[in-house]
Amino acid sequence: MATSTSTEAKSASWWNYFFLYDGSKVKEEGDPTRAGICYFYPSQTLLDQQELLCGQIAGVVRCVSDISDSPPTLVRLRKLKFAIKVDGDYLWVLGCAVELPDVSCKRFLDQLVGFFNFYNGPVSLAYENCSQEELSTEWDTFIEQILKNTSDLHKIFNSLWNLDQTKVEPLLLLKAARILQTCQRSPHILAGCILYKGLIVSTQLPPSLTAKVLLHRTAPQEQRLPTGEDAPQEHGAALPPNVQIIPVFVTKEEAISLHEFPVEQMTRSLASPAGLQDGSAQHHPKGGSTSALKENATGHVESMAWTTPDPTSPDEACPDGRKENGCLSGHDLESIRPAGLHNSARGEVLGLSSSLGKELVFLQEELDLSEIHIPEAQEVEMASGHFAFLHVPVPDGRAPYCKASLSASSSLEPTPPEDTAISSLRPPSAPEMLTQHGAQEQLEDHPGHSSQAPIPRADPLPRRTRRPLLLPRLDPGQRGNKLPTGEQGLDEDVDGVCESHAAPGLECSSGSANCQGAGPSADGISSRLTPAESCMGLVRMNLYTHCVKGLVLSLLAEEPLLGDSAAIEEVYHSSLASLNGLEVHLKETLPRDEAASTSSTYNFTHYDRIQSLLMANLPQVATPQDRRFLQAVSLMHSEFAQLPALYEMTVRNASTAVYACCNPIQETYFQQLAPAARSSGFPNPQDGAFSLSGKAKQKLLKHGVNLL
């Protein structure tokens, strides 16, 4: 036992402690500290030592919080540093070696918390639904996988485990990207990634989600989440071979980013209702100008199923600014804050787990109505009246905005049924919107024109847009009603407190907001969020995984996928042949002996800050000179993180020098292994360290790194 413990401690010398502490179980003076310890790593630590460390850290956090009104995020001791994260009564703590950069230590802790929440949901509910022994086993699996796959460079940058793309044929990378794009055209699929032997081949996910999906292969087969295995059998969706679908939880910011794909990828949801087959080809392509829609003008506009046809004036259609006969008032739209802005919880609304939610992603754009005057609206009818646009002139000469209105089906009545809920907003006088330039603009009321939302102008780059999402909100007087057929599943965020995935009759104890609402589908999917889950800022989705030997296709999808056997079959058959071919080619083309590396006269490391990917030429077994290079990289990476204005530096000792440069999207480090001429140790124009910048720019070009 002593031998195994010392071996484990040696292999994880940089990862000393990790524990999860529940402060709600230690309230009184006589409550034992051990009662609040949910998990402690390493488990071989004596219980008395666990209590001592947990009690001291919890006391420090409480003391600092009382003094500064904010909990600490990092506590530095003489030989250890502790990254700290407070989540209500729960305390997450990761103890690392002092040599590890502060930013990496905090990122590792955030990553651990993200892993747990992704597969288990909110920590409070997870420990209510599962035993502590089961969750401890899962924690052990997570930590073991992290320590096994984290190299010296990965622990400095906390980067993802990616395949070295310089060793893969570009056509194979293109094929992997095409597989993901093909899967995206299937119903309910949002985005995904492809892994080979635990390494990233291609991904559409943001780095935070990609990191969580990377550990899925090591997760237990028997998922302990409710409806994880039973849901497919409940709904008659027999899973194909080597396919698994489990419920997962993403943050609201991650959910927004998953729905912010270009228009071309979202138009497939508009062609799903009957009668749209012929009109689906008329949607403007990605990158095209929205002004081309003027060619389809016919002088007629169809609104949503509950709107009145062709009102003669805004005042007649919407008297007193209220909704009558389905007309929407001037406060019917509000933009959701982009990911990372937490100053307004009331402005966050998500339409998830439904096709309507995906259609509404169309309606994204920053809009300043204070300078827009609409003397005469141009009316356009498209796709047999199922999607119509109103063109609005923009005074600054940019491409015109297009206002859009949806029609679920031409056969629906123009007036709403009794149980139809017409989405609207709370009535703030001037809701704020965040524009591309970072300035906040006031959205003024324009009665008669607020029932439509703008769609984005053509995006020059085929990437996810970063514009706010415009989604309707549920009218306070009609919270308990249901959406019409075809729009069920649009989960509303009532008063911005929590998302409504709960069955009618359930309430969320957060102020006066009720968490009632329509379920994600007509048949009532059993894996919907409970009020407690939704109020904790998590959104439930499905993770579809298809394993083909060493290749894994992982897709994040909306909740209805779990009960849609046709969609599952479509995803499976559309990707099966391509996945088999890709697996064979990767197996044949990748180097078999990774340890055999060609000798090089220099070391380099290139870190992509946006994708959190790393590229380097270091050998598997580091030499003493490589160790000095890693020490220099760790030091300079910390300096770049603490000093954003710093963009270039060189560090040296008596035997070697390391050059580094960075910008907002990347960091690059370079070391010449040959002994530098005239390395005198003090500034000298003839010192070899001053020529490292030019050598780095020249030699790294062949690796695809451009420092010019």
From Swiss-Prot:
It comes from the Eukaryota. Keywords: Albinism, Guanine-nucleotide releasing factor, Hermansky-Pudlak syndrome, Phosphoprotein. GO terms for biological process: blood coagulation; hemostasis; intracellular transport; lysosome organization; melanocyte differentiation; melanosome assembly; platelet dense granule organization; positive regulation of eye pigmentation. GO terms for cellular component: BLOC-3 complex; cytoplasm; cytoplasmic vesicle; cytosol; lysosomal membrane; lysosome; melanosome; membrane. One of its GO terms (molecular function) is protein dimerization activity. The modification Phosphoserine is found at S355. InterPro entries: CCZ1/INTU/HSP4_longin_1, CCZ1/INTU/HSP4_longin_3, HPS4. Signal peptide: none annotated. Pfam families: Intu_longin_1, Intu_longin_3. Residues 269-331, 407-490 are annotated as: Disordered. Residues 319-331 have a biased composition (Basic and acidic residues). It is linked to Hermansky-Pudlak syndrome 4: A form of Hermansky-Pudlak syndrome, a genetically heterogeneous autosomal recessive disorder characterized by oculocutaneous albinism, bleeding due to platelet storage pool deficiency, and lysosomal storage defects. This syndrome results from defects of diverse cytoplasmic organelles including melanosomes, platelet dense granules and lysosomes. Ceroid storage in the lungs is associated with pulmonary fibrosis, a common cause of premature death in individuals with HPS. Component of the biogenesis of lysosome-related organelles complex-3 (or BLOC-3), a heterodimer of HPS1 and HPS4. HPS4 and the BLOC-3 complex interact with the GTP-bound form of RAB9A and RAB9B but not with the GDP-bound form of RAB9A and RAB9B. The BLOC-3 complex does not interact with RAB5A, RAB7A and RAB27A. Component of the BLOC-3 complex, a complex that acts as a guanine exchange factor (GEF) for RAB32 and RAB38, promotes the exchange of GDP to GTP, converting them from an inactive GDP-bound form into an active GTP-bound form. The BLOC-3 complex plays an important role in the control of melanin production and melanosome biogenesis and promotes the membrane localization of RAB32 and RAB38. This is BLOC-3 complex member HPS4. It comes from Homo sapiens.
